[in-house]
Structures are given as structure tokens and as C-alpha cells.
Amino acid sequence: MSHLDNGFRSLTLQRFPATDDVNPLQAWEAADEYLLQQLDDTEIRGPVLILNDAFGALSCALAEHKPYSIGDSYISELATRENLRLNGIDESSVKFLDSTADYPQQPGVVLIKVPKTLALLEQQLRALRKVVTSDTRIIAGAKARDIHTSTLELFEKVLGPTTTTLAWKKARLINCTFNEPPLADAPQTVSWKLEGTDWTIHNHANVFSRTGLDIGARFFMQHLPENLEGEIVDLGCGNGVIGLTLLDKNPQAKVVFVDESPMAVASSRLNVETNMPEALDRSEFMINNALSGVEPFRFNAVLCNPPFHQQHALTDNVAWEMFHHARRCLKINSELYIVANRHLDYFHKLKKIFGNCTTIATNNKFVVLKAVKLGRRR
């Protein structure tokens, strides 16, 4: 846990999933402080929109203004709810919207934590363009190293005149005034042909590797199990290309597409609808924090290409949680398959959780691993 003192309220905040006590990661950053400083003396009129509030620092600080928290992360929503409870703030004080929803009209203040992907930022700025006015206070913040010329140009192109502040604690802010510059329409998704198939893969803005098949997934697809029955999970499904391939290779199985990103799950659904519509009755789509709340002993296999970062921070906490959830939800003698960068040493992590791990394939960068849920371990 960490403490954030600001001009609105003193907060105790924690990350979600929680980090270990040996190497704790903070649930807020200097950019959050810097953004809140700008509002200390500002009279807030109209709706407050907060975009990409990773762990709820801004939403908790401004809870008395009934803000809207907008983003593409279910884990961020869970983190914000947890931090609201931790600070004794009514959860109903914050309204949650995903990035593709309609934003409230004529906001008084818009606070943006600049996301990792420029595509998501552009989608969000285009959505804001439909609702902000010239009187809306628009401020974005990030680590100074994460604000590039391309970031500023995007604000200018979509919304209007843009300036930056001096760096403070290695954070920098962007101030923008809306003046409705001319702007061409943009497609909601980016599409590309999947090599070796007749499939077209569609990707919403925040999907990992949205402009082409990532090399880890490409390697994984060469080693997917075939002719399974029952329910298979594509955990952290992204655009669903792994799950789509599983539907094709396992015609007697049902595939459950799971991701914490609403855009990822929407992309997966779209890709099944457009490429294998006959398999929709063998498909389920779930926005979730890994397999939280899913009954144990349900699945015949889980396949996962786990992330090794959360927001801008490198961490294996999300992967660790995925592995534990997979073990709980697998049937006895059923298997977890993962692909990962070799340097992450997930072999020993899986062996610790499952009691076993086998290397299926390896190349100079990636490894495909398999762990079996054995009946003797509880």
C-alpha cells in the first residue's frame, strides 16, 4: 500500500492484483499528483471524465465530484473499486464506462492518463471530440519520457491547440483547448489477413499487436493441442487468433475467450463472427480478471500468452494470477499451455504451482510450456 496526499483528500492506495512486499509497486505516480495539483484552485463545473485511471488514484481523489472513469481495463475498474472501499468512499461515487461507450456531454474537466498505445489514445480523443466544448478543461499526464512529439501532434489533430508543461518529478502534463479542427473519419478496427488461412483478423484500438500477428502467437500456433473435447480457454485472448485456431483444430470443443480488455473481447467475438460464424455456438466471450469467479474443475485445457507488464510497469503478478486461476479451474489431468519469452523463466513458476512442467518447444526467443493438474495436489 502507498499513501497519496493531494488537495482533495488523503488516500491509501494499493495495486490490483497486489504486489509482493519485497518488491512493492506503487499504485499511483507523479503524473497523478501533477494532474490533481492543476485542479486545486479550479472550480469544477459539469461532468468530470477521467480516462485510463490505472488504480483509481484520480477517481478516489475526485470522488465528491461523481466522476466518470473511462478505460479499457476491467482490472483497473476492480482496482478503483477496491481503493474506494479501502478509503471508505461509496463505490457509487464513480461511474465506470468502457472506452467504446458514449461519453457524457459537455464535461467540465477531462483528465487523461496517456495510455501506452497511440491507437487507444486516438480512439479516446475522437470520442471526446464529440462531447467536449471550448470551455472544457482538458489535461493529460504521463511520465515525461512517455510524451512524444507524436502524442502532442495527435492532440492537435483531433482536438486543437496543445501545450506542454515543464517536467515535475519526471512527469509532464499536456494542456489542450478544443477548437474542432477538420478531421477525417477513421475506421473502428484495423484488419489484416492471417497468413496460411483465408481469415481476416479485425482489431480494436487497444488490442496487442493490432497491425499483425505477433511472433509469440505465431510460434504458439505451431504447437496448439488438437482433437480436444469439452471446454478450452483462450486466457488473455487479445484478438482471439489463438482461440479461433483452437476452434478450427478442435471441432468437438467449446472455446471460452477471456480478457480483461473489453476491446479484446469485442475483437475476438468479431473475428469468430466473420471467420467462423458456424462456430459461434461453440464460443463464449468473457470480460474478466483472469478466471475470477469461475467454478473450479471446469475446463479441459487452458492456453495462455501471459503479459509481463501491467500498464507501464514490468511485473509478473498478472501472469502469476493467471497460472493460479488456471490450475483451480482445470479438471484433474487437464493441461495449461503457455508461450512466453525465454528470459521470464516461467518453467520454475509453473513447476512450483502445478508440481510439474514440460517444455513443448523452444526457439531463440520463446518457449512453449505445458503443466498438468494432478489429482494429488490441492
Curated annotation (Swiss-Prot):
UniProt-listed Enzyme Commission number(s): 2.1.1.174
Main location: cytoplasm
Record CDD domains: AdoMet_MTases
Alphabetical UniProt keywords: Cytoplasm, Methyltransferase, rRNA processing, S-adenosyl-L-methionine, Transferase
Coiled-coil annotated residue ranges, if any: none
Gene3D superfamilies: Vaccinia Virus protein VP39
Lineage top rank: taxon: Bacteria
Pfam families xref list: MTS (PF05175)
InterPro entries: DNA_methylase_N6_adenine_CS (IPR002052), rRNA_m2G-MeTrfase_RlmG (IPR017237), RsmC/RlmG (IPR046977), SAM-dependent_MTases_sf (IPR029063), Small_mtfrase_dom (IPR007848)
GO terms, molecular function: 23S rRNA (guanine(1835)-N(2))-methyltransferase activity; nucleic acid binding
Subcellular location(s) of the protein: Cytoplasm
Swiss-Prot/TrEMBL catalytic activity: guanosine(1835) in 23S rRNA + S-adenosyl-L-methionine = N(2)-methylguanosine(1835) in 23S rRNA + S-adenosyl-L-homocysteine + H(+)
A GO term from the CC aspect: cytoplasm
Job of this protein: Specifically methylates the guanine in position 1835 (m2G1835) of 23S rRNA.
Family: Belongs to the methyltransferase superfamily. RlmG family.
Record protein name field: Ribosomal RNA large subunit methyltransferase G
Native source species: Shigella boydii serotype 18 (strain CDC 3083-94 / BS512)
Gene expressing this chain: rlmG
